[in-house]
Amino acid sequence: MLFPTEFDVIVVGGGHAGTEAALASARMGNTTLLLTHNIETLGQMSCNPSIGGIGKGHLVKEVDALGGAMAAATDEGGIQFRILNSSKGPAVRATRAQADRLLYKQAIRHRLENQPNLWLFQQAVDDLMVEGDRVVGAVTQVGIRFRGRAVVLTAGTFLDGKIHVGLNNYTGGRAGDPAAVSLSARLKELKLPQGRLKTGTPPRIDGRTIDFSQLEEQPGDLDPVPVFSFLGRVEQHPRQVPCWVTHTNARTHDIIRGGLDRSPMYTGVIEGVGPRYCPSIEDKIHRFASKESHQIFLEPEGLTTNEFYPNGISTSLPFDVQLELVRSMRGLEHAHILRPGYAIEYDYFDPRGLKASLETKVISGLFFAGQINGTTGYEEAAAQGLLAGINAGLYVQGKEAWCPRRDQAYLGVLVDDLVTRGVSEPYRMFTSRAEYRLSLREDNADMRLTEIGRELGVVDDVRWDAFSRKRDAVSRETERLRTTWVNPKTLSADEATALLGKPIDHEYSLADLLRRPGVSYDGVCALRAGACAAPETLAEDDVLLAQIKEQIEIGIKYQGYIDRQAGEIERNEAHESTRLPEGLDYAEVRGLSFEARQKLTQFRPETIGQASRISGITPAAISLLMVHLKRGLGRRPTKPAESGTDSAPVTQ
C-alpha cells in the first residue's frame, strides 16, 4: 500500500486533547491522522502526575461516558485513588487519582496504536493548507503535505512557547521539547484573535533525599478503592502508594520574597497572565502575605522512579532560590532537585472566535481544542479534544455538529463559557461554574451521555451493552422500591426503630423510607419486608453493583430537587434552542443599545442562550432580539468574522 497522504481528519498534537480528538474521530469511522513532534510523548503528563479533582473529575467521567480514553488509562496507571468531598452532597463529590506517568502514557499509546482508522506520524506541523476560507490540510517541518477535510489543532503550550527560569529564558514548548514558532506565525496570518498566557511547574525532587519520617502520610481510599472509568475494575490498578504532606514556613516565605527581584513575573519579563487557581508559590506569598504556611503535597511520579512532584510550589524563580526554598521545608532539608521548576509563556487564541462546535468562525473545517483556547488542565483539554474530534468527524460526514448544552454536561458548561465569555486568564473547571450541578454529577455521566455517544458513533458495543444492563437494573429496581409498600403490620416496630429511630404509623413505599435522612439502600434491603433483589440480579461484580446502588439512592433521595431543576431547565430551553440567523444584522434590531449591537456583531452568538451570557447583554436586549426574530426581520448578510480579529485579544 502506498503511504497515505489524504485523510478525513488530521489532528495536530499528541497531548490529552489531541489523543482524545484522534480516537473519537477514528471511532466514528473517519480516516484520521495524528501528527506529533515526538511519538514517545503521546499522552504525556507535562505537569502534575494526577487526573481529576473537583469539577475536573466530572469532565473525565463525561469523556469516559462518550468512549474516551482518559479514565480507562487512569485506572491502568493510577497509583492512588481518592473521592474528594465524600462527606458532602453528590453534586460536588469528585474522583482524583495519582498516576504513574509511564503507565498512563503506555495505556494511551496502546489505545492509539490499536485504534482502527487511525494513523500516527512523527512530524511537527509548520503550516496549514488553506484554500479560500477552508482548511484543506497541514504541512510538516520537512515539507510533507497531508490533505484533510478537517483539521483539529491541539498545540498546548507549544505555540511560540518561551520557558523562564529566573531572568534566563529560551524558546520551548515544554522542558526538552521545541516550540511551534512557525505554526504560531501562520495562525497569526489568518487574523485569528490571539493573546498570551502563562503557566508553570515546580521543581522535581529525588525521593531518596526526602526524610519521610518528618512528613504526614496521605493514603488513598481503601474501602472501597475507587475506579475512574464506568467500565473500570479495581483489579486493573497497579500497586497503590501514599502521598506525603509538608508545609512552607516563615523562612520559606522570606527566601521567596528575597528572590522576587530576579523573578520573571515580578520584573516584567513575563507578560502572559497565569492561572488564578493554580498560582506560583511566589504569587501565593505575594497575594496571601498574612498566611504563615501553605500545605505542600509530595506526589510520587511513578512506581519505578524516585522522582516526586511537590504540588504547591510551582515557580519560575532562579534555580539557587528554588533549591533554598525547597530545603527550608520540613523533611526536605537535604533534598536534591532533579529538574528545576519553570514558567512557560505561550500563545492562545480567543475562544470567542469559535463556534460552540469548537470550529473556528473564520476558517471552515479548522477546530481548536485544549490550551490553545485558553484553558488549563489535562481534563479540560481532553474534554475539548473529544468534542472537537467528534465535530470534525461530523463535519466531514456532512452532519450537524453536536454542541452539548449547559444542562447536559460539564463539557457544555466549559465550551459555553469559553465561546461566550472568553478568557482573561487560564480557565479551570469547578463545580461552581455549573448552575445545574445537581443534575450533572459524576455518578450519572453515563446516564446523561452514553446514549448520545452511541448515536454519534463513539461508543462501542462493549460499553453500550454494559451501560444498557446498568440502566435497566437501575430503572427496574427503582420502580420496585416505589411500588413495594410496608405498613405497621408488615414492618415490625423493632425493625422500623432500628432503621428510622421510631415505628411507622401508616403505609409507606420502600422509596419513601429510603428518602429519609440517614437511611441507605442497603438498610432498606435488610428489612424482611424489603425483599430486595439479589445482588447478582443487579450486577455481575461489586464495582457495577456499587454504581447501581448509588444511582438508585441518589435518584430517590434527591428526586424533589432534581425535578425542580428539570423544571428550570425546561423553562430556559426556549432560549437555549432558539438559533440566531448567521447573517442577522443587529443594526436593524430596534431598541438595541450601541454596546449591545457592537458586542452581538463582534461575537456572533449562535443562540439566544449564548447571547444572554455575553457580558453587557441585558435581559431587555434579549427581549428585543426575541421580538425581532418573531417578526422574521434582519437577515441581511454580514461577515461574522470581521469583528474582533485583530492580533490583540478583544476586551470583555
Swiss-Prot record:
Binding site for FAD: 13-18
Keywords: Cytoplasm, FAD, Flavoprotein, NAD, tRNA processing
Cofactors: FAD
GO cellular component, one term: cytosol
Gene Ontology BP annotations: tRNA methylation; tRNA wobble uridine modification
Function: NAD-binding protein involved in the addition of a carboxymethylaminomethyl (cmnm) group at the wobble position (U34) of certain tRNAs, forming tRNA-cmnm(5)s(2)U34.
Protein name, entry field: tRNA uridine 5-carboxymethylaminomethyl modification enzyme MnmG
Organism expressing this protein natively: Paraburkholderia xenovorans (strain LB400)
